[in-house]
């Protein structure tokens, strides 16, 4: 830590460098979401590579596989905004639990394979619902660090990457 201070790096920046959550003094946490239907396919491998690097810096990571779940799309019914309970009214899948994990994390990492120059349908449904709930409940994910990872074979990587980045 001393060498960072000698270089004139402030405490806030120092906390980011060494992976310390400045609010609580706890290790930073990143939650990663694998939007691939294949649990340990190329998207998982890319997320795992990022997670391994984060863990080397003392940042806890968890990879959650959402790509093989049946997740209904957002209907923009607005009930999550009316209820103000940080939950989607469709509670029959894992989305509400994942919203809370994203809220508690310091960073969010999204990963998807390329499906016809876009993210897969399950990932789209998941992201639409989680970010709609977040926006209707006071911006639950505001001020969080976000990043995206795309697994691509030939083409369509840039539109898919842009689509993920539009959420974060």
Functional labels for PLM-detected ranges:
Residues 11-27:
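Short, Lys/Arg-enriched N-terminal segments with co-localized hydrophobic residues
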Residues 33-35, 66, 150-153:
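Cofactor-binding loop segments of dinucleotide-utilizing enzymes, especially the Rossmann-like FAD-
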Residues 59-69:
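A short beta-strand-loop structural module common to alpha/beta enzyme folds
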Residues 89-168:
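Helix-loop-strand module that forms the ligand-binding subsite of alpha/beta enzymes
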Residues 29-57:
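N-terminal beta1-alpha1 ligand-phosphate binding loop
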Residues 69-102:
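Cysteine-cluster motifs in flexible loop/terminal segments that predominantly coordinate metals
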